[in-house]
Amino acid sequence: MEFVTGGTGLVGRYLVAELLAGGREVRLLCRPQSDRKALLRFLDHRGLDDQRVEWCEGDLLDGSFMEEAIAGCSRVYHLAAVVSFHPKDAQHMMRVNRDATRILVNAMLHVGVEELVHLSSVAALGRVTGEPVHEEVPFESGPNVTAYAHSKFESELEVWRGQEEGLKVLTLNPTVILGAGDFNRSSSALFAMVYKGLKWHPTGSNGFVAAHDVARACHVLGDQKCWGKRYLLNAENRSYQSVFDQMADDFKVPRPSRPVKPWMMGAVWRLS
């Protein structure tokens, strides 16, 4: 039995499908408001038997519950996180992304579940001007570092603390993840905004990776026992304009034509 948090999310649904296709049994943490039907439709579309999915309803921030939830599992895939660039969500992100990871790590240590695959973010990696982003650049705070980046970096600290206390861990740091999902959540919201006629696009470029590739990496790297490692996941670097143009062309809607600086897009998205 393998335990998954965030299993109804963008990457989580692909990971659950990946595990089931590999013959695994999955215990899936969900909140009362989680959209179970969307995941079940996703699995059914791929011809996968959801009878090997055990639903576990509860709260990541409840330590006693988490100890009971993960008991008897051989590995934990921790994908649950809040992604937001709105200042009002900063405290909530820190609670879910950092504090819940601490609680999960403590629960694993207490009940003896040793293996943890943690989905982090490229945002938790450092930057050196003029150099490509890579796993060895230390994170540094600064005026342009988002609350989301801080929360993901601090969640990683909890994971590495778990390693020092006896867990086998690895982290994956994907770039912008794209895939089929809820258009109201996470990076999937980009598709919804373009479809609805978004007029702006960021200048510059970023790395992009498919959700199914991230899920596959979680599964394969865990099975290959790549413990103690950190992996940057990226498929290709593209300009924002080219990605938004491709979305618009596929939807057969006008392309976003007004360039704005990437740091301004948070305001644009909140107004759209």
PLM region spans:
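Conserved beta-loop-beta element that borders a ligand/cofactor-binding pocket
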Residues: 120, 157-180
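Conserved catalytic-site region of short-chain dehydrogenase/reductase
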Residues: 85, 122-131, 177-182
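NAD(P)H-binding glycine-rich loop region in Rossmannoid oxidoreductase-like domains
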Residues: 47-99
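N-terminal Rossmann NAD(P)H-binding glycine-rich loop of SDR-like oxidoreductase domains
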Residues: 2-22
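Glycine-rich "substrate-gating" loop/helix at the edge of Rossmann-like oxidoreductase active sites
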Residues: 144-147, 175-183, 200-212
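Substrate-positioning beta->alpha
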Residues: 154, 185-186, 202-222, 228-229
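Mid/C-terminal beta-alpha module of Rossmann-like enzyme folds, strongest
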Residues: 217-272
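Conserved Rossmann-fold NAD(P)-dependent oxidoreductase catalytic core, especially the SDR/UDP-sugar
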Residues: 90-91, 95-148, 170
